[in-house]
Regions:
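Cell-surface/extracellular proteins and modules involved
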Residues: 1-90
Length: 90
């Protein structure tokens, strides 16, 4: 569980600190995704189970918290897998 909490913090840090010119996925959330983060995870990564990454990037603290339409800065799938390996999540 500690690794997942650290992953959440690292993803949020990535979202806040990644410069515009750096490699990342920039995704504008849509109205239909407000209460279903799996939609974004499926659209971005093709993997609905990556919804916690979306939650962390958006700065949400609870799955019950609605996602306002915004620009999300997300790691690429390769960056995400590397980060998960470094933290021992996979």
């Amino acid at each position: 569980m500690l690794s997942k909490n650290l992953l959440h913090r690292r993803i949020r840090q990535f979202a806040l600190e990644t410069p515009d010119w750096a490699t990342a996925i920039r995704y504008h959330s849509k109205p239909d995704e407000k209460h279903d983060l799996t939609l974004i995870a499926r659209r971005v990564y093709g993997l609905p189970n990556e919804w916690p990454i979306i939650m962390a990037s958006a700065g949400l603290q609870s799955v019950d918290e609605p996602l306002n339409e915004q620009l999300l800065v997300l790691p690429t799938l390769s960056q995400l897998q590397t980060l998960k390996r470094e933290l021992g999540v996979i």
